[in-house]
């Protein structure tokens, strides 16, 4: 044996002896804990090194240690959306993917149909990102925020609630609340300019509350109600937590004044939903008992004055819980609250943007009015039927191109649970994938003159052959929006009611608007229009 080998063995023996002496001074529990920590650090460092290696191969701005791109993102709220879109234009135009670091967490931004499809079209990536965690106190594990098996189970339960025949029952609600909106707008006749957004938002809040819970909250008549204020307040706080890194810690957030407001809003929202669920269950129990006493198994479909009763989303959930599906009161509340959250802001944005764009383009507005005249004639009062709404094909094209330019949800986020090849780049597990809907819809290869409002983009002949992931205002793939048919019908009902009574003229110019890319894509200072009655 050579002297070098002997020397090496002696050195290792001395080292092991020293380590043994050090370890012998600690208890077995301490040694176990220290060993576990060491193993964790080694494994974490190995995985982290692998993640960084792959992420850094994706184009993107230089990042600082620990801070990532926080300095570039440390801008006013109304500038943040523009900054993110600017990064996409600067770093990702060639392959449709770029990356940023939020602190030590990587995010990839996707904005080409070919890079979006691998995420949205896979059952492997149905889990939403951590940005949705701030909705959990309100929505629990409803359809929007649930993951994996629970999401699959809930989706299966809820799909029948959006069947075409069920949606037909909601048309009367759309019409009645749209008529209230038209009456409320009458006070603005003669005004040089007013913000359309708040009027529409209160209308859609009335619609979604009545269709979700079967209860009227009269938001359009009483915008100061505690429930209405809570809906607005909780949305604002969620957006604040998403934008401000320090508020993303539950502990730090619990020390702020916003936390007390947050808890107050949650108590109001949950209290109202729980009350409605209890009352509705009691009503249905009485109806069932009366039917049994009358030896009649058919449901009592009429109220005391002979008017046909309307099913609400809540009723369908209660029925599902009776038919063997395990849904507790809390489960039902989660889904009702989710419907409330997803169903009012998104549709109000779509309606407001469409009316505004039609106000910018009177030539398209007149084509819509001609279509409405062909359906209703000179009649401005008769409510629309399901068939009437289905016949509003050009109006639907207008809504779709409005959603192309101003998608209600400008960004969607998913967790990458395993490595995936996107655009020739490996996106490692643990990354957040951000689908940039706003940028995706402005692809000149798909939509010539992408910044121009052009409803003809959605005529049947122009849609033929289009990539299925080039236009996704309601997301796409297995986790697409379950309520998209509901939304389009509601939007048609509201917009057609307004346009049958008023001519709309945009006061603001599109190029002067500042966009806020929050949970919902909003104009910072509203959408100012003027209206005149139609003869």
Swiss-Prot record:
Membrane topology type: Peripheral membrane protein
| Annotated organism of origin | Drosophila melanogaster (Fruit fly)
Annotated keywords: Endoplasmic reticulum, Heme, Iron, Membrane, Metal-binding, Microsome, Monooxygenase, Oxidoreductase
Enzyme Commission code(s) on record: 1.14.-.-
Residues that hold heme according to the record: 342, 481
Q: What is this protein called?
A: Cytochrome P450 4c3
Q: Where in the cell is it found?
A: Endoplasmic reticulum membrane; Microsome membrane
The coding gene here is Cyp4c3
**Could you list the residue ranges that cross the membrane?**
none
């Amino acid at each position: 044996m050579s002297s070098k080998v002997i020397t090496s063995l002696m050195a290792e023996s001395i080292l092991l002896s020293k380590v043994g002496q050090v370890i012998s001074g600690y208890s077995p529990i301490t040694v176990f804990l220290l060993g576990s920590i060491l193993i964790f650090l080694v494994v974490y460092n190995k995985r982290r090194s692998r993640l960084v290696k792959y992420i850094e191969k994706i184009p993107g701005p230089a990042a600082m240690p620990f801070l990532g791109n926080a300095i570039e993102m440390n801008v006013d709220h109304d500038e943040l959306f523009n900054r993110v879109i600017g990064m996409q234009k600067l770093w990702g135009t060639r392959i449709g993917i770029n990356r940023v670091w939020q602190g030590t967490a990587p995010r990839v931004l996707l904005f080409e149909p070919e890079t979006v499809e691998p995420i949205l079209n896979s059952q492997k990536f149905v889990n939403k990102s951590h940005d949705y965690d701030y909705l959990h106190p309100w929505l629990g594990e409803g359809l929007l925020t649930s993951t994996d098996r629970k999401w699959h189970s809930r989706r299966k339960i809820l799909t029948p609630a959006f069947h075409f025949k069920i949606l037909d029952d909601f048309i009367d609600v759309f019409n009645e609340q749209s008529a209230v909106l038209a009456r409320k707008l009458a006070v603005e006749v003669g005004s040089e300019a007013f913000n359309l957004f708040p009027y529409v938002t209160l209308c859609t809040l009335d619609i979604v509350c009545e269709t979700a819970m079967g209860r009227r909250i009269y938001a359009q008549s009483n915008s100061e109600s505690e429930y209405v204020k809570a809906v607005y307040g909780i949305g604002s706080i969620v957006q604040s937590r998403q934008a401000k890194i320090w508020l993303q810690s539950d502990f730090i957030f619990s020390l702020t004044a916003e936390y007390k407001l947050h808890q107050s809003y949650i108590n109001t929202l949950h209290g109202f939903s729980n009350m409605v669920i209890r009352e509705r269950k009691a009503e249905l129990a009485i109806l069932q008992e009366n039917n049994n006493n009358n030896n009649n198994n058919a449901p009592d479909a009429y109220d005391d004055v002979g008017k046909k009763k309307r099913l609400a989303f809540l009723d369908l959930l209660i029925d599902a819980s009776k038919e063997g599906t395990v849904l507790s009161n809390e489960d039902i509340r989660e889904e009702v609250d989710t419907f409330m959250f997803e169903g009012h802001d998104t549709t109000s944005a779509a309606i407001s943007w469409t009316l505004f764009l039609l106000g910018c383009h009177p030539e398209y507005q007149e084509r819509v009015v001609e279509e409405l005249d062909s359906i209703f004639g000179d009649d401005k009062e008769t409510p629309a039927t399901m068939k009437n709404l289905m016949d509003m094909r050009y109006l639907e094209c207008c809504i779709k191109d409005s959603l192309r330019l101003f998608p209600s949800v400008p960004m969607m986020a998913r967790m990458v649970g395993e490595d995936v090849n996107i655009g020739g780049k490996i996106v490692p597990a643990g990354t957040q994938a951000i689908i940039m809907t706003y940028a995706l819809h402005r692809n000149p290869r798909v939509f010539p003159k992408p910044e121009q409002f052009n409803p003809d983009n959605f005529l049947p002949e122009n849609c033929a052959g289009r990539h299925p992931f080039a236009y996704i205002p309601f997301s796409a793939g297995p986790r697409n929006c379950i309520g998209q048919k509901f939304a389009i019908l509601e939007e048609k009902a509201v917009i057609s009611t307004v346009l049958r009574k008023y001519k709309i003229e945009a006061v603001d110019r599109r190029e002067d608007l500042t966009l806020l890319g929050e949970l919902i894509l909003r104009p910072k200072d509203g959408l100012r229009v003027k209206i005149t009655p139609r003869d």
